[in-house]
């Protein structure tokens, strides 16, 4: 079997192969773009071929920026389009492609790789761990009354129904530039968020609101008329308003947009897709049970390729030190590192000291952004704590300034 990078001439073969791997047929091109594969970077795609040259597997990567805790932006490879023909499953094709791809990412100097897992059991064995989570919240419109905030000093805010800004409803085709600018402001401050390169917006490659699918967009503007949030939505049967994504530069803007869509006439319920599981919207409702959570699941998976570089890249919010014993069975690597945090900066160096925690590289990916507490994985039997208090200290160290969240599909 040969694994080789692709060129522009391989696009049709690559697309046909990945669709065949998933048992689907390629979509018909539509006016205005919108085909997901139009954003592929062909110099970052791989084809697996049999000895006689038949393509049987695919893998690709996008060039993204990932926001880390502390509002640090760093390059990250967004792995996608991974598939193997059903006729060649269980023959080592996927493992060979993953090993080839990880080596290629390292040769590019990249130390983080991320993906969305089609099936959860697949990617842990390649060193990826679930790092952000998402949920769907459904609110019956007749139960959508907001509670009166109990905290002092919150008068005249969207939480109380007061908003100095304004909301304008536009069609998706009218506001692409606004969406791109607002999303970019949002993702730079949100740990776990990925960039959406300009070419994605220009090609309309992705899911709504990037794609040209018909959508209405509620655009929020501040008191000076500057756009600072949006909600992309559509109304379908049975009388349901579905919000693809709500992007807001702060909680007040989100609340204003939530009030707007929950007040829409001629619908019986509003469905918010891709909310963080701990989002405060349920707490803002007068009836806590009115907001029904479903599809609570993983979203972004993270894989570290260089432990010291990755740990020193993110921001930290508690001083302390830990010795981490890290096993990377897929790449056949093992390392022990002393992580020292002082004044929000980390130093990470090899050490022969006794470990505080022993963990798999996939578990380090899960805790890296602060969305999974190390103590949770200790209790689950995945991380081993070698001394009392080690898990508690790890929780404090890896905590993020803001819960990580990603809603970008790729």
Residue map of PLM features:
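Conserved GNAT acetyl-CoA-binding A-motif
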Residues: 98, 102-117, 265-276
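Hydrophobic, small-residue-rich alpha-helical packing segments that form membrane-like cores
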Residues: 3-12, 18-20, 33, 47, ...
């Amino acid at each position: 079997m040969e694994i080789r990078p692709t060129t522009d001439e391989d696009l049709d073969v690559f697309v046909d192969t990945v669709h065949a791997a998933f048992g689907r047929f390629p979509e018909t091109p539509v006016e205005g773009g919108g085909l997901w594969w139009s954003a592929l970077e062909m110099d970052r795609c791989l084809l697996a071929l049999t000895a006689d040259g038949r393509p049987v597997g695919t893998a690709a990567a996008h060039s993204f920026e990932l926001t880390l805790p502390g509002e640090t932006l760093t390059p990250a490879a967004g792995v996608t389009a991974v598939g193997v023909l059903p006729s060649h499953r269980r023959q080592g094709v996927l493992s060979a492609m993953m090993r080839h791809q990880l080596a290629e990412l390292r040769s590019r100097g990249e130390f983080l790789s991320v993906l969305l897992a089609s099936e959860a059991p697949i990617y842990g064995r390649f060193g990826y761990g679930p790092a952000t989570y998402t949920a769907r919240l459904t609110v019956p419109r007749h139960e959508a009354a907001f509670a009166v905030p109990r905290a002092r000093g919150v008068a005249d805010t969207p939480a109380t129904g007061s908003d100095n800004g304004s909301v304008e409803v536009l069609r998706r085709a009218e506001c692409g530039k606004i969406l791109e600018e607002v999303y970019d402001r949002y993702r730079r401050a949100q740990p776990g968020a990925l960039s959406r390169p300009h070419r994605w917006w220009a090609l309309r490659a992705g899911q709504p609101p990037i794609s040209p699918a018909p959508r209405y967009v509620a655009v929020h503007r501040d008191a000076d008329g500057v756009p600072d949030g949006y909600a992309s939505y559509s109304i379908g049967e049975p009388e349901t308003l579905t919000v693809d994504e709500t992007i807001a530069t702060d909680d007040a803007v989100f609340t204003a947009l939530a009030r707007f869509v929950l007040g829409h006439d001629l619908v019986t319920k509003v469905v918010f897709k891709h909310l963080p599981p701990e989002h405060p919207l349920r707490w803002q409702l007068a009836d806590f049970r009115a907001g029904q959570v479903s599809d609570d699941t993983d979203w972004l998976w993270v894989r570290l390729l260089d432990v010291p570089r990755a740990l020193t890249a993110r921001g930290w919010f508690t001083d302390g030190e830990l010795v981490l014993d890290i096993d990377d069975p897929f790449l056949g690597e093992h390392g022990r590192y002393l992580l020292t945090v002082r004044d929000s900066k980390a130093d990470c160096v090899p050490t022969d000291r006794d470990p505080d925690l022993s963990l798999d590289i996939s578990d380090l990916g899960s805790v890296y952004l602060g969305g999974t507490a190390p103590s949770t994985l200790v209790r689950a039997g995945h991380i081993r704590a070698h001394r009392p208090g080690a898990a508690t200290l790890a929780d404090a160290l890896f905590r993020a300034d803001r819960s990580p969240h990603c809603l970008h599909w790729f």
